Design a protein with these regions (language model features):
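Glycosyltransferase donor-sugar binding loop
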Residues: 39-42, 197-211
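Membrane-proximal helix-turn-helix segments that form the acceptor-binding/catalytic region
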Residues: 92, 104-124
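Conserved donor-binding/catalytic core segment of Leloir-type glycosyltransferases
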Residues: 126, 157-176, 182-185, 199
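Carbohydrate-associated surface elements
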Residues: 131, 145
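Short alpha-helical donor nucleotide-sugar binding micro-motif in glycosyltransferases
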Residues: 238-243
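Aromatic "clamp/platform" in nucleotide-sugar-dependent glycosyltransferases that forms part
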Residues: 251
Length: 281
């Protein structure tokens, strides 16, 4: 049996790409073949994900479409005769981006508008969480594949002694509300732990948004907040091992893989119960 995976885009630190590659390993263990293709590819994953034009599916093959972004180039896949499964990873509502990145807002708006068309054209439409599945009008869930071993060993004891370290991991974007994380941290620091530190780990929406977060941090908690991007897997694991708490105040999440990572490292989690977050716990 062959299962071909189709993505709108593929990159080395993209959660959807990570999931697709995890599925490929699982399919291989089951003796299933197939190819992974994407409409756009970061060269760093070019050895594992091929251009969309490389898709060559036979009659009995299955196409697994990972839906996470506006993907007009994937419309042609819907016309193929093979059986098709759509897996929705969720697209953030555009309202969160208009004031910060209008182009991203347009892409999100188009992606959410296109989703029903794709869902209606496949044999099965599912979500990576019940929250996502219900956006499709159903309740079929294909769970996130999570391999704790890939993160490295959990810490053997409590975090190292020293000032409390609060951690956030995830994209630095408006809907994830790092601004509220900074404000909550400042309140905690002022009332309970003047020497506490906050580390925000993730790639920013753009330089302007990163600067806005840094400006807020410098205003409310000068010298106590650090923003980090582009960490290696080992560096990220070390941030988790040193953390005293993980704080997530996102207002839109289809799932939230960093919560699973925090659980793996034994870090206490405080998270706003929205979207797919309650399903993680």
């Amino acid at each position: 049996m062959n299962v071909h995976q189709v993505l709108s885009g593929a990159g080395p630190v993209d959660a959807v790409t990570t999931q697709a590659l995890a599925f490929r390993e699982l399919f291989g263990a089951w003796g299933w073949g197939g190819r992974d293709v994407a409409a756009s590819i970061d060269p760093r994953v070019g050895d594992r994900v091929k251009p969309l034009r490389a898709l060559a599916a036979a009659g009995g093959d299955v196409l697994l479409i990972h839906y996470s972004a506006y993907a007009p180039k994937l419309r042609g896949v819907l016309e193929l005769p093979q059986r098709k499964l759509l897996l929705s990873h969720n697209i953030t509502p555009a309202r969160w981006f208009w004031d910060h990145d209008p182009q991203a807002a347009v892409q999100c708006a188009l992606g959410r508008r296109q989703l029903p068309e794709f869902a209606a054209a496949v044999d099965v439409a599912a979500g990576v969480s019940l929250y996502n599945a219900r956006e499709l009008g159903g309740d079929t869930v294909i769970p996130i594949l999570f391999d704790p071993a890939a993160l490295g060993p959990a810490r053997a004891a409590d975090p190292p002694p020293g000032p409390p370290l609060v951690l956030f991991v995830g994209r630095l974007t408006p809907h994830k509300r790092q601004d509220e994380v900074i404000r909550a941290f400042e309140l905690y620091r002022r009332r309970h732990a003047p020497d506490a530190r906050l580390v925000l780990v993730g790639s920013p929406l753009n330089d302007r948004y990163r600067a806005a977060l840094q400006g807020l941090a410098d205003e409310l908690a000068p010298g106590a907040v650090r923003i980090e991007s582009g960490l290696s897997r080992e560096q990220l694991a070390e941030r988790y091992r040193c953390a005293h708490a993980f704080l997530c105040l996102s207002e839109h999440e289809g799932f939230c893989i960093p919560l699973l990572e925090a659980f793996h490292f034994g870090v206490p989690v405080v998270a706003r119960a929205v979207g797919g977050v309650p399903e993680v716990a």
